[in-house]
Design a protein with these regions (language model features):
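Walker B catalytic acidic pair
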Residues: 10
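C-terminal regions of RecA-like/P-loop NTPase motor modules
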Residues: 1-6, 19-22, 33-42, 54-140
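…and closely analogous acidic/polar surface helices at protein-protein or active-site interfaces
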Residues: 27-31
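Conserved H-loop
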Residues: 44, 49-51
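Catalytic P-loop NTPase motifs of RecA-like helicase/translocase cores
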Residues: 14-15
Length: 140
């Protein structure tokens, strides 16, 4: 096979399919360890989608900044990942342009250490596409 990338959307579905699992955190730890081994042994790239916990401050749907501590389930998600990217959007903004604009934030970067806002993406409801928009605060 010539598989180069795997997209796993989302981790909680994999965990919920495990028979007899009583401790979600331990199940996520075990699954993350297995996924990490697959990536290391095969060289395949893995995009893993994880849901977030409710934040202490500003809600995510109101544009709250995503952090590693908000990954739901286990610290192993962040510990075993090379890069963690969060998507942030204020779905409640009065301005439809802002409401459909997403910040792509690098939260962890094992390769270079660069973290922070990487770019802004604008959603076009006519095409269903995201397009990068100019942003002076991006590090790229």
């Amino acid at each position: 096979y010539d598989c180069q990338w795997i997209v796993l959307d989302h981790l909680s579905i994999v965990v919920s399919d495990q028979d007899g699992i009583l401790d979600e955190r331990k199940a996520i730890d075990a699954i993350m360890t297995k996924l990490r081994k697959i990536v290391q042994q095969t060289g395949v790239g893995l995009f893993l989608i994880s849901h977030l916990r409710r934040p202490q401050g500003k809600a995510h749907e109101e544009g709250g900044q995503v952090s590693l501590s908000e990954l739901r389930g286990s610290a192993a998600i962040a510990q075993l990942s090379d890069i963690v990217i969060g998507l942030e959007r204020n779905q409640q903004d009065d301005d439809p342009i802002i409401r459909n604009q997403t910040t792509l934030r690098v939260i962890k970067n094992r390769f270079s250490g660069l973290t922070g806002p990487a770019c802004k993406l604008q959603y076009d409801s006519d095409t269903g596409r995201l397009t990068e928009v100019d942003d002076e605060h991006s590090f790229f």
